Amino acid sequence: MEPVKMTNSSDDFTQSAEPFKLFAEWLADAAKSEPNDPNAVALATVDPDGLPNVRMVLLKDFDETGFVFYTNYESKKGQEILSAEKAAMCFHWKSLRRQVRVRGPVEKVSDAEADAYYASRPRGSRIGAWASKQSRPLESRFALEKAVAEYTAKYAIGDIPRPPYWSGFRIRPVSIEFWHDRPFRLHDRVLFTRPTPEGDWNKDRLYP
């Protein structure tokens, strides 16, 4: 039997020495090829009983300190993160046949960071942050629309302040895994790990 022949990648990511530059390159590739929301990511948290929850959020910033997203701290995910102080993310770009998994402790972003991002949002989204009691029971669509109308009237003139319960989280990764599809399920996997968010990265290539 002849050995399985594998196609080569145009850019051999398995040679990358650190994860953040590689992630930036992959995200830029996704921005060119994904039809919708290349920064969409599945965010996993756990409740007090250890039962996991997962939902899609949007990555809003990243650098060598971590991956940032924003939410209502009083929402279910906000409460679970504040309790566990840990989370995981999974990016999947179907058009590129690539995946990135991120795990680590979570910290709040600074008020200055949250204020700057909140101010950049469309006015309607800022109103929505006040009107929505995220994750709580909603009696009807009309009740939500009424709340939106009330806050629209309240902030009809001038700036809209950021709600005290609305801010961001930063996952400070201790594990980042890159996955690329290959024929016959002989995929490429590279795992970067470090003992703490301040530590040096160790790199391992993994069996598919």
UniProtKB/Swiss-Prot annotation:
Record's keyword terms, sorted: Flavoprotein, FMN, Oxidoreductase, Pyridoxine biosynthesis
EC number: 1.4.3.5
Pfam families in alphabetical order: PNP_phzG_C, PNPOx_N
GO MF entry, a single one: FMN binding
Cofactor note (record): Binds 1 FMN per subunit.
Entry function: Catalyzes the oxidation of either pyridoxine 5'-phosphate (PNP) or pyridoxamine 5'-phosphate (PMP) into pyridoxal 5'-phosphate (PLP).
Protein name (database record): Pyridoxine/pyridoxamine 5'-phosphate oxidase
Name of the gene this protein is made from: pdxH
